[in-house]
Amino acid sequence: MFKGSRFGLVALVALVAVGGCTQETPQPDRTGTAVVTVGMPFTSLNGGTAEGRAPGSTLIRSLVQAGFVSIDEDGTAVLDEGFGTVEKVSDAPLTVRYTIDPAATWSDGTPVTPADLLLEWAARSGQLDDVAPELDAQGEITNDDELDAGVAFAAASPALVQAQQLPTVDGATLTLVYATPVPDWQVALDVNVPAHVVGQSALGVEDPAEAAAAVSTAIVDENKEALSAISGAWRTDFDADALAQHVDQAVSTGPYAVDLVVPGERVELVRNDEYDGEGAASFDRVVVRSDLEPLEQVEALAAGSADVVAPTDTRDVLDALDEVTGADVRTGGDSTLQLQLQTAGAGAFDPATYGGDAAVASAVRQAFLLTVPRDALVANVVAPLWPEAVVASALLPTVGPDAGGDVAPSGPADVAGARGLLEDAGVTEPVTVQVLVNTTDPLRAAMLALITESAAEVGFEVEPYAPVDGLGPDLVGAPDAWDAALVPVPQSDLPLDSVLSRWRTGGATNVTGWTDAATDAATTALAQTVDPDAVEGQLAAVAESLDAGGAVLSLVRQPIVVATRGSAAPTAGTTPAAPDVEPLALGRADLTDWWAWARTG
């Protein structure tokens, strides 16, 4: 019998650090080759795993993987009908039909078939798993042997766990029926890793069509022995270390294909001659390097050994770029930095601290947020790195930077208003606020200093909280240790579910313990919404409830920079040009449109 989900793995904060071996680096005499440098390494080609959704992996996948849909900066689903169609054929129950276009082909020449979708459903629905990962305080898996012995895709999706029935296949179509409404139905399922490669690796079937069919048969028959091998291959065969040894398994559907993986150092992509969709490759080869420090990236640009560099946006980096002859430099914004207030840790903002008086706790939260000098944070900390920076007023950045509307308009700190709220609430003693923050980041450290100074005028004693187990683990597992978290909030691959999971009472990622009747009513309505045109209004209602309750405050988007060699560069004309490259926002869940400069049309 197919069963409901037993577990869900949610990545809240990704801190990626990977070492690697070295090989000879690309040389400047590289006709037809574009070299990109970034600060995040590629770790997996499997977008169903946490490693595959890490920023460096998302960057690579967005160029080598095509599919039914991509996600733009605003969280909107962008359909690619050249790959196939996604149709909602019924609302009750929610039923979605996928039809694969005959032109959709893997880079080894094998056609894309419903077997590829069926494999992804099996992996992400959790219906076939019979063992769940056990994690330590750092989020590391501790029961690898049990996972290897059982059926453990270990990648249940909050959306696909609601698709509990075995999908039906008819020719080039696969039909999925959900047990409950799923607002993210447009992006919940897509082609990910190739079923035929998994079948060849896990089941030893050589012929691609027969290998894909064998995977489908194992899923339909619930063959535990075969599924154990299939789930293990799905989970590990597309990691960087595995692909470094077997790059032939890095089969893809997009305009480029993976040709070489050097873990922790670089990935080399080549033109995919089997690709027949829009936006074909405009270079013979694209090399993405992650082995250079920020200033080394600038040096590579100056030397002509890199064409596009995306180093960390710091004053030193910008000054160095100013010295590069002919460099075209663009700055922009990435993930939104927010102050999220802990309401369940028996601390400064928890009603329990005030004898259970929710109104007093709300007043303290509102007062603290009024002391935050957002205009000064932008002008003094961020604008020197990104002159166009503005105060971020939308509260739901996991959907997109403008999701939820401008519910918290910008302005200077309102010290008088904050003092009045505390007086009316009868709070006369100083309030200590422990802030969970990465103080090794100069940007956030400078922001915290301004927040501390302003809040002190009202009687808030702001102190940085040093994480014990790490920023991510303490964000999730130590609610009684901090009162506010100053954290970047990246976009989610399931934008609407991310709002539900984060803000409704008892949500899987509700790390601040937020509970509020208005928020719950708004998220309940959002959870029932399957009309994409109705989503904006539902998100606005959620955001308004959060603003009214003093749950969270958006500050500003993190500054980012990208630089390319302009026409005045000494090396111009000797290596490929990379025009119109936008700043690289690695906090996005999908970077397909960022790669427009590397594609035709």
Q: Which residues make up each language-model segment?
A:
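Structural transition elements
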Residues: 385-424, 439-444
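N-terminal lobe/hinge region of extracytoplasmic solute-binding protein
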Residues: 37-91
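Surface-exposed binding/hinge segments that line
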Residues: 136-234
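Aromatic- and charge-enriched surface segment that lines or borders ligand/interaction sites
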Residues: 86-150, 172-180, 184-188, 297-300, ...
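Alpha-helical secondary-structure segments
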Residues: 112-122, 171, 175, 255, ...
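Ligand/substrate-recognition segments at binding pockets and active sites
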Residues: 262-265, 419-491
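Ligand-site clamp/hinge motif
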Residues: 123, 244-247, 273-320
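Extracytoplasmic/peripheral linker and loop segments enriched in polar/acidic and small residues
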Residues: 22, 365-366, 370, 378, ...
